[in-house]
Amino acid sequence: MSGMEATVTIPIWQNKPHGAARSVVRRIGTNLPLKPCARASFETLPNISDLCLRDVPPVPTLADIAWIAADEEETYARVRSDTRPLRHTWKPSPLIVMQRNASVPNLRGSEERLLALKKPALPALSRTTELQDELSHLRSQIAKIVAADAASASLTPDFLSPGSSNVSSPLPCFGSSFHSTTSFVISDITEETEVEVPELPSVPLLCSASPECCKPEHKAACSSSEEDDCVSLSKASSFADMMGILKDFHRMKQSQDLNRSLLKEEDPAVLISEVLRRKFALKEEDISRKGN
C-alpha cells in the first residue's frame, strides 16, 4: 500500500488542506476541471473511393480557402482531392459538391470590377483622337506657312500691277481664298468641320474670257505660267487660312490677359501689398532724408 500511495499524483492545491483558501490560483484550480477539450472532427464525404483520394486527405483544410476564393463563375466549391478537368467538359458530381460559403468574397471578381472602372470611357477616347487629328492638321498648316515664304515674293505689287500680263489669271483665285477660310473652323468641342470649297475656274475658261490669251503669240506664255500660278495661289490660300487661325488665337490670348489683369487689380491681397510697399518706400525715403 505504501508503494501505491507513493505513485499517486496529488495536485499542489490539494497537497495541503489549509492551502486552498490561501491563494486565488488554488481556489480556481479546485473549481475548474483541468481536462483537455475535445478535438474537432470532420466527416468524410460519402461514396468516395480510394482511387479518388490519392495522396491528399478528403478533409478540407485552411489551404482550400484561397482556392475557393479564386474560383471564377462557380457557385460551388470542391476539395483539393478532386481532379479539375477542362472547364467546358467538367460536370460536378452531386456526391462531392459542397455549398459555397457566401461569407468568402470573390476577390478576383472585385479586382476585375475595379479595373473596369479605371478604364477610360469611349467619349474620352474619341475626344483624344479628335485632339490628335486637330494637332496634326495644325502642324500641316504651320508647315504650309513656312513654305509660303517663297510665294510671298511672287505676290509683290509688281506682280499685281495693271501692266503685267498675269493679272487675268490670279485675280479669280483671291476670291476663292476668302471662301477657303471657312474650311477649318475650331469650335468649342475641338471638332473640325470641312466646308465644300467651290472649284477654281479652269485656265481655258479664263483664256476664253480674255481675248488676248487666245492669241497664238500668248499661248506659249500662258502654258508656261499656268503651273507657277497654281502653286503660288495654293500657297497663298493656305497662308490666308493659317493667318486667320493665328489672328483668332491672338485675340483669345489678349482677352485672357485682359481678364487676368482685371482680376489682379480687383484682388484685395494685391491692393494690400501695393499699399504696404508704398508705405515702406515712403518710410525709407524719410529715413534717408533725415540721415542726410
Curated annotation (Swiss-Prot):
Compartment(s) of residence: Mitochondrion outer membrane
InterPro entries reported for this sequence: Mtfr1
Record PTM Phosphoserine, positions in chain: S41, S103, S110, S224, S225, S238, S261, S273
Post-translational changes noted in the entry: Phosphorylated by AMPK. Upon stress, phosphorylation at Ser-103 and Ser-238 by AMPK is sufficient to induce mitochondrial fragmentation.
Job of this protein: Mitochondrial protein required for adaptation of miochondrial dynamics to metabolic changes. Regulates mitochondrial morphology at steady state and mediates AMPK-dependent stress-induced mitochondrial fragmentation via the control of OPA1 levels.
Residue numbers carrying Phosphothreonine: T30
Keyword entries, A-Z: Membrane, Mitochondrion, Mitochondrion outer membrane, Phosphoprotein
Pfam families: Mito_fiss_reg (PF05308)
Entry keyword Cytoplasm: no
Lineage of the species this protein comes from: Eukaryota, Metazoa, Chordata, Craniata, Vertebrata
Topology in membrane: Peripheral membrane protein
Protein's UniProt keywords contain Membrane: yes
Source organism (scientific name): Homo sapiens (Human)
GO annotations of cellular component type: mitochondrial outer membrane; mitochondrion
Protein name: Mitochondrial fission regulator 1-like
Broad class of the protein's primary localization: mitochondrion
